[in-house]
């Protein structure tokens, strides 16, 4: 359980644009969450990822920064890892024979590690959430929470700007 949250979804019925975010009922400060993935049970751990959160898999040097269309979501660790796998699959699909075998091998190794974390004792990965608004969390007894450094606060993207609507729209 991750406390009371409000889900805010703004959408345009004309064009289909949509933005979703999760805001905790209690005030939060900027923070980071880290979880070392060592067993299959951790894949079931609940997460809340807000639209301002940067998600990383440290050992693989993979990072997803919030962009202008970033949305928040509630999922589990496995769901977060699946999002990384889908991106790797897209990149692999875009590579052609002219690309180096080294790139393809590296991507396939990343995919193997993500798909086998918790199943293969030799695969351990660190999942990290950095959220300058403090709305994200990893809910697992082994997850650690920390304050963000000043350098992190200055360098982290904060996600999409809130939608602004005028009375004339």
Regions picked out by a protein language model, each given a short descriptive name:
Residues 1-3, 9-11, 17, 23-169:
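Long C-terminal interaction/binding lobes of large macromolecular proteins
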